[in-house]
Amino acid sequence: MSAGSGRIPLWVVATIAGLGVITVVGIFFYGAYAGIGSSI
């Protein structure tokens, strides 16, 4: 796997992955706080 093989910059992938994780964690904690976490 060479660093120049992909057309998408690594920082873009890392940013999207980070936002995805933050979103999932945020939804999880929001659901638990709202009391609907057990229904998921």
Swiss-Prot record:
Please give the GO cellular component terms listed in this UniProt entry. Answer: photosystem II reaction center; plasma membrane-derived thylakoid membrane
A single Gene Ontology biological process assigned to it is:
photosynthesis
UniProt cross-references to NCBIfam families, sorted A to Z: PRK02565.1 (NF002722)
Give the protein's biological function: One of the components of the core complex of photosystem II (PSII). PSII is a light-driven water:plastoquinone oxidoreductase that uses light energy to abstract electrons from H(2)O, generating O(2) and a proton gradient subsequently used for ATP formation. It consists of a core antenna complex that captures photons, and an electron transfer chain that converts photonic excitation into a charge separation.
Cellular localisation: Cellular thylakoid membrane
* Highest taxon above the source species: Bacteria
Q: Where are the transmembrane segments?
A: 8-28
Can you say what this protein is called? Photosystem II reaction center protein J
Matching Pfam families, A to Z?
PsbJ
Q: Which PANTHER family match?
A: PHOTOSYSTEM II REACTION CENTER PROTEIN J
Xref: InterPro entries: PSII_PsbJ (IPR002682), PSII_PsbJ_sf (IPR037267)
In terms of HAMAP family, this protein maps to: PSII_PsbJ
Q: What is its main location?
A: membrane
Keywords associated with the record: Membrane, Photosynthesis, Photosystem II, Reaction center, Thylakoid, Transmembrane, Transmembrane helix
Please give the subunit comment from the record: PSII is composed of 1 copy each of membrane proteins PsbA, PsbB, PsbC, PsbD, PsbE, PsbF, PsbH, PsbI, PsbJ, PsbK, PsbL, PsbM, PsbT, PsbX, PsbY, PsbZ, Psb30/Ycf12, peripheral proteins PsbO, CyanoQ (PsbQ), PsbU, PsbV and a large number of cofactors. It forms dimeric complexes.
Q: How does it sit in the membrane?
A: Single-pass membrane protein
Family, according to the entry, reads as follows: Belongs to the PsbJ family.
